[in-house]
Amino acid sequence: MAKIRIFELARSLNMTNPDLLDRLKEMGIEAKSHLSSLEDDIVEKVRQGVFRTEVEKPEKVEQKRVRSNVIRKRRQPVKSEAEPEAEAPAAQAPEAEEVTAPTAEEAVPEEAADADVSAKAETPTAPETPEEAEISVSEEAPVEEAADQVPPTDEAVDPAEAAPAEEESSPSRKKAKAKKHQAAKIIKFPDAPQRLSNKGVLEVVDDTAPADSPAAPAAATPAGEKDKKPSRKDRKKRGKTESVETEEAVPVKKKGVFKRKEIVEGVALYDRTRGRMRKKGKGGAKVPGGAKTQITTPKAIKRKVRINESISVAELAKRMGVKASEVIARLMGMGVMATLNQQVDFDSAALVAAEFEYEVEKASATEEELLELNVEEDQGNLKKRAPVVTIMGHVDHGKTSLLDVIRQSRITEGEAGGITQHIGAYKVNTANGEVVFLDTPGHEAFTAMRARGARATDIVILVVAADDGIMPQTIEAINHSRAAGVPIVVAVNKIDKEGADPDRVKREASDHGLVPEDWGGDTMFVNVSAKQKLGISDLLDMVLLQAEMLELKANPDKKARGVVIEAKLDPGRGPVATVLIHEGTLSVGETVVCGIHYGKIRAMFDDKGAPLDQAGPATPVELIGLGGVATSGDDLFAVGDEKSAKTVSENRQQKQRTEDLARKDSISLENFFEKMQEKEEKVLNIIIKADVNGSCEAIADSLQKFSSGEVKIHVVHSAPGTIIESDVTLASASNAIVLGFNVRPSPKVRALAAEENVDIRSYDIIYDLIDDIKKALTGMMSSTFEEEVLGRAEVRELFVIPKKGTIAGSYVLDGKIERGRPARLLRDGVIAYNGVIGSLRRHKDDAKEVASGYECGIGIENYNDIKPGDVIECYFLREIKPEL
């Protein structure tokens, strides 16, 4: 059902918001403010109530002449139909020939002060005798804006209160009394000044006529009474009494024209100023309290807040004009624990703003619009591209050697330890077309690298050694490929080696869902030998056949998009990123966004180091020009202008800062005890520096696995690049050790480390790094002890020896009793004492140990309360070294 707000309904009814709210309150309709909504049935009810003609009995207006130039007008309650006829002669003026034109002074609210009111004067025929002179009351002419017309109050004045007022005859006393209740005099010139139409006849303007009633000629009614419909302002101010008096007319230069002065008494003045100028003080008259101060609300067009992707709590509160504590309270109600300077996202800000009746708009284009992510691709622009193939498998199964044969290169010879510890991208020209290869590490520490390779590829070549079979990292590679939905081609390597069994590989692969085609499955198996260069062409044919089945296409004429394979910080060139272009063409000089960084491409190189001006789809390149070291796996987008790139980068950086703050641990009542226990843990602080960003991630992830309940690894800092002085300073401040992987510190840095007593360790092979850290953590852990019972002896007789105490003559029941070992005294199965065996004798000779079946004398250090029948149990604690 459609709804309408109160301020819209008031506008359609030509009413003010307070008037309509009062009207709704009288009708029993609950409404909090003018921004509240009403249902259609309630709106129709309100419209009928406003426009319905209200017929009320006419009120008698009693006019009495106080003196020759003052007329007092009072409203009297209607008692019966016979009373107007009885009191009609009282309204006639006894002396009409001395009447001058007075000005009717009434309390006018602020809304009516500027209303354009024109009085339509009637000129009746002058009576022949003074007794026939009557006061004719003319109705007020209609005005254009009915909402601004406010007549005086309709409440009748009690005769007891009116009597003292009639006794006042002095104009000066009357003025003084009026000034006592007013804050200032308001002088107003009427638009149409009144004139004396005839001698003895006075025209009095009656403001009691409703604003929406048409002007009608004044009829000579008894006592000057006429019909009147109370307006909305009358009902609002019912219960308040204001005396309306006319003061002495002030003549001006023109003859017959009189100037009117208006006295605004205290009650009217209070209503007009909404309580701001209420009369106070010891001698001030008591004035009834007015309406409460209305809280102003901005217009609908001003109740909009324009923000970007996020905004701080303080800034949001400032733009809405509310207290920040109120915004924080609303966020807490939504389950968001935010501080004053914490950033909230667009959706959270919109929900909070709605609580304060504000609307949130995005100040700039969204990231999807700036990067053109939702643009539909025209199928006619797609062209065939080269397949991207990732080589995966267990460590030392021959992945890089196989790639060397395909590329006719010698990558393996330059690798430390003969293992791949980076992810590489290469483009190879074969007889059947181009193929892009991604070489991933096989060590268990490089899980994240293998996952990125599986997501960025079209086909996976799973290398399995024929003599080794399926290994843990092989299974992990299978899972990564399945998660990415990438087809797998199995290359059974080392078939020339002794003990090779390709059928064993097929059986084990079938157990993991890779069923060979010759066994009725859909997985291609190729037997190869990288060392003997056997089966290489067959493997490439299978890969290209699989690529044709996938129908790989891309649009080279659009803005480039790609993914970061690897990133590093080069000392001479700055941040360098290895990027695989997925679609579009990337050119030197273009502005790109990559993760939280952006920049203009200064140079590009292929996998062999040759410079490039452009790079099309399925092309691996090294690019220089980013503002920082990108994170492996970040997407790269070419942007039309630098301003858009900067906007996207700043928004992403702000999101990352917000996430980093959210990840920081905070103390609460729930986790206070846990935090206190963590302080007792032994923490090993580490700073990791490596040649590429992927190695930093791999090392950090591998070391975090060693954290346990007693020892914990805290990575203080991790970044690609060489070890510099700031790393040593940070390590000294945080009591950390510096681990370098494929990087070396300079002599100056080594001297600073020696001065600051900072331990710097450099490694080329990740095995050695992980083993050293594991040993260090093991040494930090406390050993545990396990109790082992040696033997038990029963006490049968007691001997008291001076200077040595009580000696228990005992019989060894089982095991053996050794001197100096811990022992416990058991009495009726309950431990009576824990101590150490101080003396052990057999036949008056000291003995080191006594075996079972023999008698001996046992003395317990510092304990003599031994009784016959007790059992002495001898044991020792075995130390168990901790393991990770």
Curated annotation (Swiss-Prot):
Residues in tr-type G domain copies: 384-553
Protein biosynthesis is among the record's keywords: yes
GO CC terms: cytosol
Residues covered by region (G3): 439-442
Biased composition, class Low complexity, residue ranges: 87-106, 207-223
CDD domains in the record: IF2_eIF5B, IF2_mtIF2_II, mtIF2_IVc
Binding site for GTP: 393-400, 439-443, 493-496
Record region (G1): 393-400
Region feature (G4): 493-496
Annotated region (Disordered), positions in chain: 58-248
Region feature G2, mapped onto this chain: 418-422
Highest taxon listed in the record's lineage: Bacteria
Keywords recorded for this protein, A-Z: Cytoplasm, GTP-binding, Initiation factor, Nucleotide-binding, Protein biosynthesis
G5 as annotated region, ranges: 529-531
Keyword Ion transport attached: no
Pfam families (alphabetical): EF-G_D2, GTP_EFTU, IF-2, IF2_N
Basic residues bias spans: 66-77, 172-183, 229-239
InterPro entries per the UniProt record, alphabetical: EF-G-like_DII, IF2_II, IF2_N, P-loop_NTPase, Small_GTP-bd, T_Tr_GTP-bd_dom, TF_IF2_bacterial-like, TIF_IF2
One Gene Ontology term of the molecular function aspect: translation initiation factor activity
Compartment(s) where it occurs, according to its Swiss-Prot or TrEMBL record: Cytoplasm
Family: Belongs to the TRAFAC class translation factor GTPase superfamily. Classic translation factor GTPase family. IF-2 subfamily.
Function description: One of the essential components for the initiation of protein synthesis. Protects formylmethionyl-tRNA from spontaneous hydrolysis and promotes its binding to the 30S ribosomal subunits. Also involved in the hydrolysis of GTP during the formation of the 70S ribosomal complex.
Record-given protein name: Translation initiation factor IF-2
Organism: Desulfosudis oleivorans (strain DSM 6200 / JCM 39069 / Hxd3) (Desulfococcus oleovorans)
Organismal lineage: Bacteria, Pseudomonadati, Thermodesulfobacteriota, Desulfobacteria, Desulfobacterales
